From Swiss-Prot:
Binds 1 zinc ion per subunit. One of its GO terms (molecular function) is ATP binding. This is Cysteine--tRNA ligase. Monomer. A motif ('HIGH' region) lies at residues 38-48. ATP binds at K281. The keyword Cytoplasm applies. The keyword S-adenosyl-L-methionine does not apply. Coiled coil: none annotated. GO terms for biological process: cysteinyl-tRNA aminoacylation. CDD domains: CysRS_core. It comes from the Bacteria. It comes from Chlamydia caviae (strain ATCC VR-813 / DSM 19441 / 03DC25 / GPIC). It catalyses: tRNA(Cys) + L-cysteine + ATP = L-cysteinyl-tRNA(Cys) + AMP + diphosphate.
Amino acid sequence: MRQSSESKQKLYLYNTVSRAKELFCSSNDPVKLYTCGPTVYDYAHIGNFRTYVFEDLLKRTLLFFGYSVRHIMNITDVDDKTLAGACKKNISLDAYTAPYIQAFFEDVASLNILPADVYPHATHYIPQMIEAIAKLLDEGIAYVGQDSSVYFSIEKFPTYGKLSQLKLQDLQCCSRVSSDEYDKENLSDFVLWKAYEEKRDGHIYWESPFGKGRPGWHLECSIMAMELLGASIDIHAGGVDNIFPHHENEIAQSESLSHQPFSRYWLHSEHLLVDGKKMSKSLGNFFTLRNLLDRGFSGEEIRYMLLQSHYRMQLNFTEEGLLACRQALKRLRDFISRIESVYPESSHISEDMQQHGEGFLQAFSEAIANDLNIAAALAALFDFIHQTNSTIDQANFTQADANYVLDIMKRINTVLGVIPFSADLEIPDHVKQLVEEREVARSEKNWKQADALRDQVASLGYSIEDAKSGPKVKKL
């Protein structure tokens, strides 16, 4: 483990298996982290990104505390939904999924989510999946059903249900289920290899010793995780809807293949609601990230909204809440702008400022170390901002203090990823053009035109501050 000033902080994470907070310990360097990525049959919605932002916070926290991390996030490019979409359009699976894969990476960048080390595509690991199925068949853990599909026998895995806390003996099991997604009421043997049906699958299939077909969704993640991280990993994360059946089935398959514990920690984020209701296209409250960006909200505003609540609490997404996040970011932006101003020179940081900064860093670290308690971390941040502003108002602030505070803000932003620093602000070309036109109008003393151009820039979400060195453009 890489050492840092924060590395002595103990990190506690809520493990879904034990239903308790546990001290995080890793014998691996780097930490092995696997997160379930997008199923690329459509554009990802904001509920998906609530999970991805939580996973990003988890990864950033590990890095903040001095761990190195190897992060794998899969791309599910073959399942019931992707196959149905490709067949409906009568195009190849690659042609169907490619635009959604590209959109996913663009969306991730707009939310400032750190990239994974590898994004494996399920379709690139079909041979390894076939090999795993053959092994499970040989060991009598899997069997071929009457429909020629291959199924995993959950009765052959005695601890099945340990993640979702199901007890097989207390439940009425169906014989088998071939769908990728199902609920606990339909508990059954699940599909490892789905036999080809021409009417349903069209031209999409793979050859195997078990006949034409394609792998089951649950097997895909098991194989990609083990191929890229090994038989045992440190952390597996996803949304609560992944607990059953997906993650439960991953455990059964993986541990049957390796005879080792699959993952030591399982973390899951809660659902996102929209105006207090479950997101649904029929209710008209279904949003993709692109919907919100098109309505004028920024990636950092959406990230802040998705980040601000504890990951194990349901998040109620409202437009009013998003506008409140805009104001919170404005407060952060104004503070950074104030800190980046010029102050009296000093050769050292004041003792009060140093104590103030160290106290804040301790409070922030303790908050995120307590199962990623982001609400407490943000409360500590805004208290720090309030106290620092008071110090500046009292004219007890030097350039050394400003540099110290700016360094602290940059350090905590490695966790938050939302603080808008002036140096990071990218002004769109069309805004730059308007600013240049305004400078021409000002040089010609055409004040009416200059004011009109300033208003136009403001309508696009930016302000212009005139200075001797030239105009400074800031995000409103």
